[in-house]
Amino acid sequence: MANEKRQHPRAEITWPVTVITHNGPVDGRTQNISLAGTLIRCPEVPDLDDNFRLVFKPAGRQMLLATGEMIWSDILLDDKYAFYAMGVRFTYVPEHDQHVLGEAVLEHT
């Protein structure tokens, strides 16, 4: 994504993520991620509050925590399946998790 003009570049990183909703957890996967937010793919539409918690589970790393807000959502199609996608802007990421996230983004850009 070299031509991107974003303040925080995105990296194509696929991590398991759990979206914590008031109706319980919804599991999904990141499609890309930056220091400012992420694109999440889920098999179902999460029932979200204004701000919600995210638990990222990258392989070989500790879990990362964040709080976010949904900026957009859509139902998308790939070759065989429909899935729910949502763009999330982070509203809070603990300092240590920001550092780990930044290292992961640098490794993949």
Identify the role of each PLM range.
Residues M1-L35, G102-T109:
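N-terminal helix initiation/capping motif
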Residues N3, I13, D78-T109:
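C-terminal output/interaction extensions
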Residues A11, P46-L48:
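Short, well-ordered loop/turn sites that connect or cap secondary structure elements
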Residues I13, V26, F52, L64-A66, ...:
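Hydrophobic core residues within well-ordered beta-strands of beta-rich domains
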Residues W15-V19, D49-L64:
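Short conserved beta-strand and strand-loop elements enriched in small hydrophobics
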Residues H22, L35, S73-D79, E95:
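Short, conserved beta-turn/loop elements at beta-strand boundaries and strand-helix junctions
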Residues T30, G68-M70:
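Conserved hydrophobic positions within beta-strands
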Residues C42-E44, T91:
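A structural micro-motif recognizing beta-strand termini
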